[in-house]
Design a protein with these regions (language model features):
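Low-complexity, intrinsically disordered regions enriched in charged/polar residues
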Residues: 1, 7-11, 47, 99
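Bacterial Sec-dependent N-terminal signal peptides
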Residues: 3-7, 13-38
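First exposed extracellular module after export/assembly in secreted or surface-exposed proteins
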Residues: 28-151
Length: 151
């Protein structure tokens, strides 16, 4: 009985000793990715055209302030939406960037035309690499620009 108890104790000690693992000495890798979108629309008519750019990002922490637009941080906004009225004034180009690394990004783009044509450009850079670069796309009554991208 004593011999069995000693063997069991020894087995328990050895199990505990070898099941403990040394902590990693390196710092954990930063997760997430950075993004920069450049969107231009020229010739948009607010009464005849439909333009919609929606960019949504998120991280695992539920951070709400994700984006800056043309250098201005958009507090408490995880999504940015641009419509036809954003392109009929003096600003025709918008640069939308993450203010911190995010885990998921999705974009939805729809440009329709019902009269005179207009041009759009959509460029997506993820971690500094150009992923999508549709430059000078003409949108007219026969050709729309409708896409959904996940990065």
């Amino acid at each position: 009985m004593k011999k069995g108890l000693k063997l069991l104790s020894l087995a328990l000690v050895l199990t505990l000793l070898f099941s403990c693992k040394k902590d990693s000495e390196g710092t954990p890798a930063t997760s997430g990715k950075t993004a920069k979108f450049t969107i231009t629309a020229n010739g948009v008519n607010s009464s005849d055209d439909y333009v919609s750019f929606v960019i949504v990002g998120g991280d695992t922490k539920g951070t709400k302030t994700i984006w800056k637009v043309n250098g201005v941080t958009r507090n408490n906004e995880a999504a940015i939406s641009l419509g036809k009225d954003d392109f009929t004034g003096s600003t025709k180009t918008y640069v939308i960037e993450t203010v911190l690394p995010v885990d998921v990004i999705t974009t939805s783009v729809q440009s329709l035309n019902f009269n005179a044509s207009y041009q759009i450009s959509y460029k997506a850079e993820i971690d500094g690499k150009v992923i999508t670069n549709d430059d000078g796309v003409t949108v007219d009554v026969n050709k729309d620009y409708t896409h959904q991208f996940d990065y």
